[in-house]
Design a protein with these regions (language model features):
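Short, solvent-exposed helix-loop connector elements
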Residues: 13, 122-125, 249, 265-279, ...
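Extended C-terminal regions of large enzymes
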Residues: 310, 317-403
Length: 507
């Protein structure tokens, strides 16, 4: 154990377990997680399988756009991870059904592991351990359900249809509120200011009385998102008028923007100091990582355009002696940035990813039926594999091509799934007896066994791609006549050109 400095100049316990401890913690987690997952609230998105920050943002967006809840209660718990009550946590685990006393003793000792230079902690969960995120969710699970039972999951005495239940609740004195939580960062969505203010006071008192946790008065407040932004997980959200509707507008928040700029400037400094393939790849990885996380902001293009402008002078001045006009574009560059009309900068012969090359992507709600621990839930996780012949997939996995590289055989499996078991030219289902894995650029011309250079086609199409003589071409044109149309012919000609053959025409 050690202590980690945090922004407020305090020290936070950082517990990074050794390999033996990590194995034990992982074993405990694998036993506890299925039990806890069944009891956790649906809209707790932090540190849970298949859920992410983007699902939390999506839920908040949904409540603002569709339910028209425009008053947000921002609550900031003071040093949550440092102030978890150990005794209360163990009691919460017991009430969840985790009643093995030996296991609870092990967890208790883990929580009280000595921190070098500080001693034995009396409260808090050390960050850095495998089990700590799950324990933090157990602590706040009680809060999730307490808030949810005020309205969302409230059970009336009479049985109602879904619509009639909502009408009955509206006519009662219950306060409409919904919780969206990611770890210790959570929002309450309410319909009016009065309800939001009451919710803030109620949650403040509940946290103190039940969990012995304090909230920060300066950071905890009610926000009308029609007038002001609410910050959540690196985004800032506000409701704006769009036509006759009011919809969420989201940007990268100010703190996250400064962090992105800081990371980019650090990568530029590395490029200037050492313009190598390694530092270029590190720079590109940082840009792509930022784009992937923040692309769900509706105004992400404007935000990154501003960031690109702010770092442009630094990038130009630091790289003007090391940049080139020509080089190669990676597969990732072509996939993510190939359609952008932005001047390409090359360093060490590799294209730098453009900072402003980003478009917004619609954020999707989490499907509550997805679960690692039920048969139905696992089927939804692997939904993309539906329609793929599992017998053929199994055959490809169990029968690698002898004499070929491991990369080639591994990519055949990925390729079959990626093409959904269909020929890339005709769209016909691939069969074990009628499928060939074609190198787009042949090995003789320098082609490799990488995924991007391979494609599955039916056998006759493969022979047509490589056919040279008129007789052979005509023979396979006749055989594949029912598959050949304008679209498939364009694909065949592209593949023929890559192997150095002439284009074909339908007479």
């Amino acid at each position: 154990h050690d202590a980690l400095p945090i922004c407020s100049s305090d020290l936070r316990p950082l517990g990074i377990p050794c390999i033996e401890d990590r194995l034990i913690q992982q074993c405990i987690k694998q036993v506890l997680e299925p039990i806890c997952e069944a009891k956790f609230h649906a809209h707790n998105y932090g540190f849970r399988p298949n859920r992410s920050t983007h699902h939390a943002i999506s839920r908040m967006t949904f409540l603002a756009n569709r339910a028209h809840l425009h008053y947000v209660v921002d609550i900031d718990i003071k040093g949550f991870f440092d102030n978890v009550n150990h005794g209360k946590l163990l009691k919460q685990m017991w009430s969840l059904g985790i009643q093995d006393k030996s296991l609870l003793t092990i967890i208790s000792k883990m929580l009280k592991a000595e921190i070098e230079g500080i001693g034995i902690p009396q409260k808090g969960t050390p960050q850095g351990g495998i089990l700590s995120p799950l324990l933090s969710n157990i602590v706040l699970n009680e809060l999730d359900w307490w808030i949810s039972n005020q309205w969302e999951t409230f059970e009336p005495r009479h049985k109602y249809t879904s619509y009639n239940k909502f009408s009955a609740l509206k006519s009662s004195k219950l306060k409409q509120m919904y919780i969206v939580r990611y770890a210790d960062d959570f929002k309450l969505m309410c319909r009016d200011y009065e309800t939001a203010q009451k919710a803030l006071i109620a949650v403040k008192n509940w946290l103190k009385e039940r969990l012995d946790l304090d909230i920060s008065p300066e950071k905890s407040k009610v926000i009308n998102i029609r007038k002001n932004y609410s910050n959540f997980l690196g985004f800032k959200l506000k409701v704006i008028k769009k036509g006759r509707k009011k919809v969420i507008k989201s940007n990268i928040n100010d703190k996250a923007t400064k962090k992105v700029i800081s990371v980019i400037l650090e990568r530029i400094k590395e490029l200037k100091k050492s313009p190598t393939v390694k530092t270029v790849n590190r720079y590109n990885a940082s840009i792509l990582g930022c784009h992937n996380y923040y692309r769900y902001a509706t105004y992400v293009n404007i935000d990154f355009s501003k960031i690109a402008f702010l770092v442009s002078n630094n990038l130009y001045n630091s790289t003007k002696r090391i940049r080139g006009k020509t080089g190669s574009k990676s597969k990732a560059y072509i996939n993510y940035y190939g359609n952008y009309n932005i001047k390409t900068v090359y360093i060490a012969g590799i294209a730098l990813f453009p900072i402003a090359g980003i478009k917004t992507k619609n954020v999707m709600n989490f499907s509550q039926n997805i679960c690692d621990f039920t048969k139905e839930g696992r089927e939804l996780i692997h939904d993309k594999l539906k329609g793929i012949n599992q017998n053929i997939l199994q055959y490809i996995m169990e029968n690698p091509i002898q004499g070929e590289t491991t990369e080639y055989n591994d990519n055949r499996v990925s390729l079959y799934v990626g093409q959904k078991g269909k020929c890339s030219v005709t769209g016909e289902p691939l069969l074990i007896s009628n499928m060939d894995c074609h190198h787009k650029i042949s090995r003789e011309l320098g082609g490799k066994d990488e995924y991007a250079n391979l494609t599955f086609v039916i056998c006759d199409i493969h022979k047509l791609i490589h056919a040279i003589t008129k007789e052979t071409i005509q023979n396979y044109m006749n055989k594949t006549q029912k598959f050949i149309n304008e679209s498939s012919l364009i694909k065949i000609n592209k593949l023929r050109k890559l192997v150095g053959n002439c284009e074909l025409y339908i007479s």
